[in-house]
């Protein structure tokens, strides 16, 4: 299994995994649909602004790695589907919960089991946080080698975060004594965590407003 994906490649693969599950009637994706999905504001971190040429180049790189396939499907518009997992062309096999967790890690970066349970539940069922932790354990012990890694717990946090192992851009985690640069890194991490939590609250608020409108109430 190739573990040398760039940020843009992980975003494209994550999007294809996501849309295959959440909007199967619109899958495979055209180049235009893929660009829009890569750049959407919700369920993404970091938020990107990729142009069509960049996404096309990323698709070409993934095709050379046999992780994406493009086909016309009887029309003039070429559409793309992944070969990342659970296909006859690759050796990586994942169950539904593993796919959901890996997808969220590809789309959002490092997350805690609690965050993963909340976010991945749109793609697979997780009865509780323990179910998410069990899924992470299976990914850690995968027969092809660890597919995720647990990061050292950040100061003041109850849970450790996990990140995927499909990228060559994974940065080593500093475990040395705190320094000025370490303090800055910790501060930035706290800001990122707050941004993620705020985004989740905004999504919940939007969903609640939608439900209220469906009930005929004015917000």
UniProtKB/Swiss-Prot annotation:
It holds the Pfam family DUF480. It comes from the Bacteria. InterPro entries: DUF480, WH-like_DNA-bd_sf, WH_DNA-bd_sf. Coiled coil: none annotated. Belongs to the UPF0502 family. HAMAP family: UPF0502. This is UPF0502 protein HCH_06091.
